[in-house]
């Protein structure tokens, strides 16, 4: 499975996001969103899409991998001020140029934005929309699904009933109880619930005074 950012268009996919300046001559440190770092070796030009503004093509002068990310040096970006203008931009390539996957593998960019439905017999219950994919939990990637609450759902063949990436729809048959409150929570959801519990406890203590 190739990981890419959720920020994609029909014609481009994001392979990195620029996070900070690096050095004094225009280099930028970028978070990787691809399992295929050789994409940077194969290309002399990349596309940069800022948070606000138009996508533009830049010539890649140099790159090296550093602390789990990649440092990029673009032609024409020569100073820290130049580099700061690229912060939070998406680094993209044309969709047609993305790496070929092994049979049965899936691009994260295809998963993100899909509506996920839990199937019970002939009934389909919408769980939410896939916002991201978490690879840090173990062998099986977890779909980060946001609906009434956030769920982490293993993306495994045994749960899959059907996928239609053109229609942005995934159907799954999930084990009983997986979507209940005692199901595994993401770190963000745990922190939110802890914060709510702390506020409730503090309110109770104030009433006792």
Curated annotation (Swiss-Prot):
InterPro entries: PRC_barrel-like_sf, PRC_RimM, RimM, RimM_N, RimM_N_sf, Transl_B-barrel_sf. SUPFAM superfamilies: PRC-barrel domain (SSF50346), Translation proteins (SSF50447). GO terms for cellular component: cytoplasm; ribosome. GO terms for molecular function: ribosome binding. Its main location: cytoplasm. An accessory protein needed during the final step in the assembly of 30S ribosomal subunit, possibly for assembly of the head region. Essential for efficient processing of 16S rRNA. May be needed both before and after RbfA during the maturation of 16S rRNA. It has affinity for free ribosomal 30S subunits but not for 70S ribosomes. It comes from Koribacter versatilis (strain Ellin345). The gene is rimM. Residues 184-209 are annotated as: Disordered. The PRC barrel domain binds ribosomal protein uS19. HAMAP family: Ribosome_mat_RimM. Belongs to the RimM family. Binds ribosomal protein uS19. Keywords: Chaperone, Cytoplasm, Ribosome biogenesis, rRNA processing. GO terms for biological process: ribosomal small subunit biogenesis; rRNA processing. This is Ribosome maturation factor RimM. Residues 187-209 have a biased composition (Basic and acidic residues). Residues 103-178 form the PRC barrel domain. It is found in: Cytoplasm. It holds the Pfam family PRC_RimM.
């Amino acid at each position: 499975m190739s990981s890419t950012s959720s920020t994609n268009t029909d014609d481009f996919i994001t392979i990195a996001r620029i996070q900070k300046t690096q050095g004094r001559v225009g280099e930028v440190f970028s978070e990787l969103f691809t399992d295929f770092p050789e994409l940077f070796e194969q290309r002399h030009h990349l596309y940069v899409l800022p948070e606000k503004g138009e996508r533009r093509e830049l010539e890649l002068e140099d790159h090296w991998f550093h602390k789990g990310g990649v440092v990029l040096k673009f032609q024409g970006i020569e100073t820290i001020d130049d580099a700061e203008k690229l912060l939070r931009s998406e680094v993209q390539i044309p969709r047609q140029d993305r790496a070929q996957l092994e049979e049965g593998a899936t691009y994260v960019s295809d998963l993100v934005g899909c509506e996920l439905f839990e199937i019970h017999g002939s009934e389909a219950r919408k769980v939410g929309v896939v916002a991201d994919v978490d690879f840090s939990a173990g062998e099986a990637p977890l779909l980060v699904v946001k609906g009434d609450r956030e769920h982490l759902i293993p993306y495994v063949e045994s749960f899959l009933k059907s996928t239609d990436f053109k229609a942005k729809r995934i159907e799954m048959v999930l084990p009983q109880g997986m979507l209940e409150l005692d199901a595994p929570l993401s770190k963000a959801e745990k922190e939110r619930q802890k914060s709510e519990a702390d506020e409730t406890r503090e309110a109770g203590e104030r009433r006792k005074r």
